[in-house]
From Swiss-Prot:
GO biological process: innate immune response; positive regulation of proteasomal protein catabolic process; protein ubiquitination; ubiquitin-dependent endocytosis
Provenance organism: Rattus norvegicus
Lineage, uppermost ranks: Eukaryota, Metazoa, Chordata, Craniata, Vertebrata
Keywords: Cytoplasm, Immunity, Innate immunity, Metal-binding, Transferase, Ubl conjugation pathway, Zinc, Zinc-finger
Name of the featured protein: E3 ubiquitin-protein ligase NEURL3
Pathway: Protein modification; protein ubiquitination
SMART domains for this protein: NEUZ (SM00588), RING (SM00184)
Length: 254
């Protein structure tokens, strides 16, 4: 099993470039010879892949969406896991990272908003020392996906699910694009209020899904999600109520 990671003690240790683990892959995954590209052969599931080594808190995992396939609902999932892929038989991997792998192991992942996973987009994601999972697309602002990743006590591997509309992805070197590693994550108050809806990228995010509390959606998109799947696209919790944020609502029309 992997050893404990200490960012303070190992900040200057050279890191091996990230690639996909060659053996622990979903049943529909095909990797190229360099293990930098993962493609889902068919259907919409069985696309789980892992990084070949543990990832440090704050380290960016960067990838490019190579191919988008219409006809499915939802796309790429990203996150982190304490599950060492070297100890996992590919035949034992479930079809989905959310919720299957999360229920079977200490794994924390989230669905990326639809606008993130268009072909050609560069996505990077990371977890900070507080256990907050962030992602951003191209040179955009960071989006807080969840706040419950356990970063102490065991290594974390990056996990991705080449799911649904996302047909193929390619891992990139974060150092090749300065914007990937630049900038600190925004405070929670800036991430979760008053921004554009992360689904339509047009209307103001003024609606909160309950009970999970994610509030990165406009009212129209939130109700569409509620009627379609009734699960939060960020954390997959069951939606029981859609609530308009009072602070945003009071400012409408002013």
């Amino acid at each position: 099993m992997g050893s404990r990671l200490s960012p303070e003690a190992n900040a200057e240790v050279p890191r091996e470039a990230l690639s996909f683990h060659g053996d622990a892959t979903g049943a529909q995954v095909h990797l190229d010879d360099q293990r930098s590209t993962a493609r889902r052969r068919s259907t919409f599931h069985d696309g789980i892949v892992f990084s070949q080594r543990p990832v440090w808190p704050g380290e960016r995992v960067a990838l490019r969406v190579l191919r988008h396939e219409d006809g499915w609902c939802g796309g790429l999932r990203v996150g982190f896991t304490r599950l060492d892929p070297a100890q996992v038989a590919a035949s034992c991997l479930p079809p989905f990272v959310c919720p299957d792998l999360e229920e079977q192991s200490p794994t924390w992942a989230a669905l990326l908003p639809e606008g993130f996973v268009r072909a050609g987009n560069v996505v990077c994601f990371w977890v900070n020392r507080r256990g907050w999972l962030f992602a951003k697309v191209n040179a955009g602002r960071p989006l807080l996906l969840r706040k419950d990743v356990l970063v102490q006590g065991a290594p974390l591997w990056a996990v991705m699910d080449v799911y649904g509309t996302t047909k193929a992805i390619e891992l990139l070197d974060p150092k090749a694009n300065a914007w990937i590693t630049s900038g600190e994550p925004m405070p929670e108050s800036e991430v979760t209020s008053g921004e554009e809806c992360v689904i339509c990228f047009h209307n103001t995010a003024n609606t909160r899904l309950m009970p999970c509390g994610h509030s990165q959606f406009c009212g129209s998109c939130a109700w569409h999600i509620f009627k379609d799947t009734a699960r939060c696209p960020m954390c997959r919790w069951q939606i029981e109520e859609v609530a308009v944020e009072p602070s945003v609502k009071s400012g409408e029309g002013s």
